[in-house]
Swiss-Prot record:
<dbReference type="InterPro" id="IPR044524">
    <property type="entry name" value="Isoase_HisA-like"/>
</dbReference>
<keyword id="KW-0963">Cytoplasm</keyword>
<dbReference type="InterPro" id="IPR023016">
    <property type="entry name" value="Isoase_HisA-like_bact"/>
</dbReference>
<dbReference type="InterPro" id="IPR011060">
    <property type="entry name" value="RibuloseP-bd_barrel"/>
</dbReference>
<comment type="pathway">
    <text>Amino-acid biosynthesis; L-histidine biosynthesis; L-histidine from 5-phospho-alpha-D-ribose 1-diphosphate: step 4/9.</text>
</comment>
<comment type="similarity">
    <text>Belongs to the HisA/HisF family.</text>
</comment>
<feature type="active site" description="Proton acceptor">
    <location>
        <position position="8"/>
    </location>
</feature>
<dbReference type="InterPro" id="IPR013785">
    <property type="entry name" value="Aldolase_TIM"/>
</dbReference>
<dbReference type="GO" id="GO:0000105">
    <property type="term" value="P:L-histidine biosynthetic process"/>
</dbReference>
<feature type="active site" description="Proton donor">
    <location>
        <position position="129"/>
    </location>
</feature>
<dbReference type="InterPro" id="IPR006062">
    <property type="entry name" value="His_biosynth"/>
</dbReference>
<dbReference type="GO" id="GO:0003949">
    <property type="term" value="F:1-(5-phosphoribosyl)-5-[(5-phosphoribosylamino)methylideneamino]imidazole-4-carboxamide isomerase activity"/>
</dbReference>
<dbReference type="Pfam" id="PF00977">
    <property type="entry name" value="His_biosynth"/>
</dbReference>
<keyword id="KW-0028">Amino-acid biosynthesis</keyword>
<dbReference type="GO" id="GO:0005737">
    <property type="term" value="C:cytoplasm"/>
</dbReference>
<keyword id="KW-0413">Isomerase</keyword>
<protein>
    <recommendedName>
        <fullName>1-(5-phosphoribosyl)-5-[(5-phosphoribosylamino)methylideneamino] imidazole-4-carboxamide isomerase</fullName>
        <ecNumber>5.3.1.16</ecNumber>
    </recommendedName>
</protein>
């Protein structure tokens, strides 16, 4: 398992939004590049970078910052937020990203997705942004039925997804263990867990689920790391323990 720090960018700043709503910005930091370097220095093995301005407003003014982060760190960077067509995904891949996170594009027809995944499957990871049995798209401003997405993922033979609990994201309310266990029980995907991870206790709970299933690839943490609610070294020790 890995711990991946999350860096969300809105109007060139690092932000944290409660449940993805821009009117609920909780934290702001001026320099995303410095934060990315900081996490690499702390020992992060990868970074999770989301362009919230592109996801929510459809504005791509953070491209230069994203490219600079990729240039200035030596660890893998996954990017997401507004990657809703093949051209934009290819552009990010050409920057040298580890992988592109997609969700809204999964609404497109199966032929389009088959072509995309056959060409870039190792460079794409679907994000299942979960809210009460539905999946958030378009910056979590719209929702679609999970079944519609699942059928396509199965046909595309997707094996790994990010599972984000929207109701917990940015809230520091802790993880919903039952949501995670239910999702794992009903589906065959390996998952990365995001949304609501707020304490060392949450890390321990996730590690215990991993011991039961061995299907959790890692955790993606934003606000709790930024606010110091989770100590990086302690969390790493728990994740890496046998």
């Amino acid at each position: 398992m890995l711990i991946i720090p999350a860096i969300d960018i809105y109007k060139s700043k690092v932000v944290r939004m409660e449940t993805g709503k821009k009117e609920k910005i909780i934290l702001e930091f001026d320099n995303p590049i410095d934060l990315a370097k900081y996490w690499e220095k702390k020992g992060a093995k990868a970074l999770h970078l989301i362009d919230l301005q592109s996801a929510i407003d459809g504005i791509d003014e953070n491209k230069n910052i994203i490219r600079e982060i990729i240039k200035n760190v030596s660890i893998p960077v996954e990017v997401g937020g507004g990657y809703r067509d093949k051209e934009k995904i290819e552009e990010a891949i050409n920057w040298g990203v580890w992988r592109v996170i997609v969700s809204s594009i999964l609404e497109k027809d199966l032929g389009y997705l088959s072509d995309l995944f056959s060409k870039y499957k190792e460079k794409i990871i679907p994000s299942i942004d979960w809210y009460d049995g539905r999946v958030g798209i378009k910056g979590w401003q719209d929702f679609v039925e999970w079944r519609n997405i699942k059928d396509k993922l199965d046909l595309l033979r997707v094996k790994e997804v990010i599972f984000t609990d929207i109701s917990r994201d940015g809230t520091l309310r802790g993880i919903n263990v039952e949501n995670i266990k239910t999702f794992l029980r009903l589906h065959d995907y390996d998952i990365w867990i995001a949304g609501g991870i707020s304490s060392i206790e949450d890390i321990i709970k996730i590690k215990n689920i991993w011991k039961e299933t061995e299907r959790i690839k890692g955790v993606i943490i934003g606000r709790a790391l930024l606010e110091g609610r989770i100590n990086w070294e302690e969390a790493e020790d728990i994740i890496n323990a046998g």
